[in-house]
Amino acid sequence: FPGVCSSYHLHHVAGKVVALAEFEEYGTAYAHDIIKNAQAFASALAAEGFDVLAESRGYTATHQVLTRHGDTDSGAGTKAARLLEDAGIITNMNMLPGDTKALTPSGLRLGVQELTRVGMGTLEMQEVAKLYARVLLHSEDPSVVKDDVAHLKSDFQTIRYCFNEENINGYPF
């Protein structure tokens, strides 16, 4: 039990209807802005000195950006993810081409969908890339950078690409 189906969960229907209606209304613009931000972020990271994958193909055609932080299977991606987390930035350690060990990958997988959802644009992607560089390239104390991360985020509290967005504070706590 419950196997593949536990019940109808009718209380989920209303939320799904609203989410799908919002996606129908705003999904195209949201997807466009995510890709534009991901490409701007990748370009800004490369300008800061990061090894961003797929430069010859425009870095990305999705919400994801991949960066390499050391030799294959070196664990540099794991270390980078932990340092960024200490600075209040959540990323995803990720195996990259050539890596063979899931627990010691060389890369990070970075997404911009949440940053886009709260209204950040291409200019903010440059600011975020600078925060990454301070931690990972310039070895600045993550606890110092964390204050600047919180300050940047404090200007972006409203959920976008949804109905009644002027009244939706996504981060009240």
Residue ranges and their predicted role:
Residues 52-119, 167-173:
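Conserved PLP-binding catalytic core of the aspartate aminotransferase-like
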Residues 28-31, 78, 122:
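Conserved strand-to-helix beginnings and helix N-cap segments that scaffold or border functional pockets
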